[in-house]
Amino acid sequence: MVTIGFNRDNNNALPTSIRFDGTAIIRGQGIHAFGAGCMVSIEKNAVLDVGNNFGCTGDTRISVKKSLVIGCDNLWSYGCVIMDNDGHYIFDENHQIINEPQGIMFGDKVWMGCNCIVLKNVTIPSYSIIAAGSKITKKLHGQNSIFTTKGIVLKNKVYWKA
């Protein structure tokens, strides 16, 4: 089941926008939920691949121009920004694009706190926790870890339950 714009009330409705010009793959029979105020944009020739039991609460922004793979059992808090691109292309003196989109991959069972930013060419390993307010700009290493800004490991050998 896919739920879009949940937790809305008539007095405080946040607009929710989902645009699929590319390919969206929703795997499994579990819950796939995008909260109120989420904005999801999948550009032409891009792929969003969402594993079983995914949930993100309100006001999250997802922009995919190449690929975003989300493993199973991911839970994201509100106010997150996930972008596999820079929003606009930058060209060199030969008119060649110098900032191509680069894919993002979330492993299985990733919990991301509120107001996180995940940018292009990032891999987040399975069984990770991303601390609230973190900005992730590189591939992370290690499972069962809490990561904070710049991919710094805050603690190892941890796990979470919803």
Walk through the language-model features, giving the residues of each.
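Tight coil/turn sites that cap or link beta-strands
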Residues: 45, 127, 133, 142-144
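Short, hydrophobic/aromatic alpha-helical segments in well-folded domains
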Residues: 114, 131-132
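Short-chain dehydrogenase/reductase
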Residues: 111, 129, 146-148
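Flexible, glycine/small-residue-enriched loop-and-beta-strand segment within the central core
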Residues: 1-123, 139-141, 150-152, 157-159
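Long, ordered, amphipathic alpha-helical scaffolds
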Residues: 134-135, 162
